[in-house]
Regions:
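Active-site and donor-binding regions of nucleotide-sugar-utilizing enzymes
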Residues: 1-214
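C-terminal amphipathic helix plus adjacent low-complexity
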Residues: 1-15, 348-405
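Conserved catalytic-core segment of nucleotide-activated headgroup transferases in glycan assembly
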Residues: 61, 207-277
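Catalytic donor nucleotide-activated moiety binding site of glycosyltransferases and closely related
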Residues: 105-110, 145-148, 255-287, 330
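Short acidic active-site motifs
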Residues: 128, 173-174, 289-293, 350
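Catalytic binding pocket for nucleotide-activated donors in carbohydrate/polymer assembly enzymes
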Residues: 182, 203-204, 208, 307-378
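Donor nucleotide-activated moiety binding/catalytic core segment of transferases
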Residues: 266-310, 314-315, 319, 326
Length: 405
């Protein structure tokens, strides 16, 4: 959690001051020149590179759709390819911050002070987005993220302005997510629906469509009977020291295997020291290489809490769950171990035993473990989730009245 909100109050204050200078004040002087018309369009709202890749197929299939992000939002390699919503006026709403923080303190106690930096970031999104919706009057908004502060604010603003909303699941969900609150939700499989039902009342229509972003790759399942190439996918919650220790163990114990480290695209740490320490270690740049392209070059995946486990199993890549460190934020966060998708190792020797087993024999039907997570797996619509999602979205849009001008 320290990567998201520093434990030190002084560091949190420094983060707030940096946000105020670079984002709030910086946005005032940063021009916005959108290449596409936002008025009356179907907005595909993205908050990350992964979101962009999850929704881009809709942009290609629906001519009336445009990809949209908040001003200054980092979308990785697609920063220049999305339209931007101005956040210049966000600065005007910070007079509310003391009252909001005090109100949260009364309901949430000390947690409000612990995360005062995150509360600070969220101020003003709702009001700015209400103005934007009233100005542009989009036909509908399609989300790929349902829990970031700006995405939640846009969803609430859409409800207030009567703009229809849809949601396309882009990664695995957990029971810690907000309740499903869109007019149309296109989920990947029964796992997601079961978890959202535990989050609270499910609003609107729900359809299970499989995993659209995997369509192109499902026909390229890994049929290798043994493990020779191993990928390690890490994110900001994984501790650098633990990752280094794991690599030291694996490279020493398995000199015949090829190991590739893939940090999350949002991970800003410098892992150059690993290249110098272990010249045989390969790297995958998540900002440049699609996750399925990465997995297509692996026979096994080692990772902690990431939906890359599911994507691996869909391609018949062995999935090994191993936590890099002792942080208490998540433990089998997505339930992959509990539902038999991934096999777990609690220690490096246990991880070594699992890897040796798969080194000797990797089953060719591992992908069947993912049926609970992907509704189209093993059906005639396997590999056609994009077509199914676009068809359902188009029918839903056609059934809704056009906004009055």
């Amino acid at each position: 959690m320290a990567k998201i909100s520093p434990a030190s109050p002084l560091r949190r204050l420094a983060k707030v001051l940096g946000y105020a200078a670079l984002r709030l004040v910086g946005n005032v002087f940063r021009p916005i020149r959108n290449p596409e018309q936002l008025q009356g369009a179907v907005w595909l709202y993205v908050v990350s590179q992964n979101n962009y890749e999850a929704l881009h197929f809709i942009r290609e299939a629906l001519p009336s759709s445009v990809l949209v992000a908040g001003q200054s939002k980092q979308i990785g390699r697609y920063n220049q390819q999305v339209n931007r919503l101005s956040l210049r006026r966000k600065l005007l709403y910070y007079w509310q911050y003391p009252a909001v923080l005090w109100a949260l303190h009364k309901t949430e106690g000390q947690r409000a002070w612990r995360f005062f930096d995150l509360v600070f970031n969220a101020i003003g999104y709702y009001e700015v987005y209400v103005r934007a919706l009233r100005h542009y009057q989009p036909r509908a908004i399609v989300f790929a993220n349902d829990h970031n502060d700006d995405a939640r604010a846009l969803l609430l603003a859409a409800r207030a302005c009567g703009v229809p909303t849809a949601y396309v699941q882009h990664a695995s969900v957990s029971t810690n997510f907000p309740p499903l609150g869109f007019d149309l939700s296109l989920l990947e499989g029964q796992d997601a629906l079961d978890k959202y039902r535990q989050c609270g009342p499910v609003h609107g229509r729900v359809e299970l469509v499989g995993m659209p972003k995997a369509d192109t790759f499902l026909a390229q399942k890994n049929r290798s009977p043994e493990v020779r190439r191993v990928g390690l996918a890490i994110n900001t919650l994984d501790e650098t020291e633990a990752v280094t220790a794991a690599l030291h163990y694996l490279l020493r114990e398995f000199p015949a295997l090829t190991f590739t480290l893939r940090p999350h695209p949002g991970d800003g740490r410098d892992f150059g020291f690993l290249t110098r320490q272990y010249p045989e270690l390969q790297f995958s740049d998540a900002r440049q290489q699609n996750v399925f392209e990465f997995l297509g070059q692996q026979d096994a995946l080692i990772a902690a809490d990431t939906s890359t486990h599911l994507e691996a199993v869909l391609l018949n890549v062995a999935s090994l769950y191993f936590r890099f460190g002792t942080h208490g934020v998540a433990d089998d966060y997505y339930g992959y171990v509990a539902h038999g998708l991934s096999e777990r190792a609690y220690s490096l020797p246990e991880l070594g035993e699992l890897l040796r087993r798969y080194q000797e024999h990797k089953p060719t039907d591992l992908y069947r473990r993912a049926a609970y997570y992907n509704a189209t797996l093993g059906t005639p619509e396997e590999g056609h989730s994009q077509q199914r999602a676009v068809r359902l979205l188009a029918e839903w849009l056609d059934s809704r009245p056009l906004p009055a001008r």
